[in-house]
């Protein structure tokens, strides 16, 4: 896939083989700890500290580790944040940066998570910078910076979709109303619906139809969707590359792949 950095969102990979391969192929690893903006309370702080110490000691000799990060889109509680910062400086020989938060403190926020036309990415940083404290003061045409999370809805190929969507549900696709409100349809269970509303599935469906024409069945829609996937991803990368070292520093696509068959946030499917 030509990635040169992989972010382990909330510390989601522990397998030695992953780190061995990253070492071998020169892929940098942004390594989160296990805290998330909506789930930041730690029931047993001492157990958390012991686990964090074990993690750093076990992985610190992997040259692929580039950054340790305390939490996703928030900061750890002060007690844990201070512990992580001091422990990493001590145990990892102060060789690597520790960031409290994945999208603040000099980073450029998060998002968007739905498909946007290429022009959008060239003309505005496209981020909800409200997360940044202090906020980026540069208006909409600056603030690209280092974006650690940006993505889009992404339909897999028909060959994949037919493996997890029952044939009786292939066509027609859910209506806009169903995408917005339905809980129980099979599409929503695979994150094409309200479960992933910030991927804007209605806009994704309408963009495929508007830009590449109405389809007569699922296979045709999936084929056209690949063109939209390419256009949106290409726009993100090219916009950041166009401004590289002139406001932009890099971006990490949310995300590489899903843990479950899905219609959102992937560069290759389950």
Where do the PLM segments sit?
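Active-site-adjacent substrate/metal-binding segments within catalytic domains
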Residues: 1-67, 186-231
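Hydrophobic faces of well-ordered beta-strands that scaffold small-molecule active sites
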Residues: 6-8, 29-32, 98-100, 146-151, ...
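Residues that line or immediately flank small-molecule/substrate-binding pockets and catalytic motifs
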Residues: 10-13, 72, 102, 255
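Flexible loop/turn segments at secondary-structure boundaries
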Residues: 13-16, 37-39, 74-78, 106-108, ...
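Short, glycine/charged-enriched secondary-structure capping and boundary segments
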Residues: 21-23, 44-45, 82-84, 160-162, ...
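Active-site region of glycoside hydrolase catalytic domains
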Residues: 56-179
């Amino acid at each position: 896939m030509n990635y040169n950095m992989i972010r382990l969102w909330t510390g989601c990979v522990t397998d030695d083989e992953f780190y061995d391969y990253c070492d071998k192929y020169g892929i940098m690893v942004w390594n989160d700890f296990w805290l998330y903006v909506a789930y930041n309370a730690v029931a047993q702080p001492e157990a958390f500290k012991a686990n964090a110490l074990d993690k750093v000691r076990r992985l610190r000799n992997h040259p692929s580790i580039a950054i340790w990060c305390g939490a996703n889109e928030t900061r750890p509680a002060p007690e844990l944040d201070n512990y992580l910062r001091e422990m990493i400086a001590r145990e990892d020989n102060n060789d690597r940066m520790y960031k409290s938060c994945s999208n603040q403190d000099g980073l450029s926020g998060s998002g968007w998570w739905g498909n946007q036309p290429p022009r959008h990415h060239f003309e505005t940083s496209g981020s909800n910078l409200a997360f940044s404290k202090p906020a980026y003061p540069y208006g909409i045409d600056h603030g690209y910076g280092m974006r650690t999370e940006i993505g889009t809805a992404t339909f897999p190929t028909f060959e994949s979709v037919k493996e997890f969507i029952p044939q009786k549900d292939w066509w027609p696709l859910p209506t806009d109303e169903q995408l917005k409100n339905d809980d129980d349809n099979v599409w929503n269970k695979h994150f094409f619906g309200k479960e992933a509303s910030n991927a804007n599935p209605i806009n994704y469906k309408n963009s495929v139809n508007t830009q590449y024409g109405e389809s007569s069945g699922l296979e045709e829609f999936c084929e056209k969707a690949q063109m939209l996937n390419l256009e949106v991803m290409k726009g993100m990368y090219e916009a950041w590359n166009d401004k590289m070292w002139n406001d932009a520093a890099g971006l990490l696509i949310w995300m590489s792949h899903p843990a479950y068959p899905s219609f959102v946030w992937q560069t290759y499917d389950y």
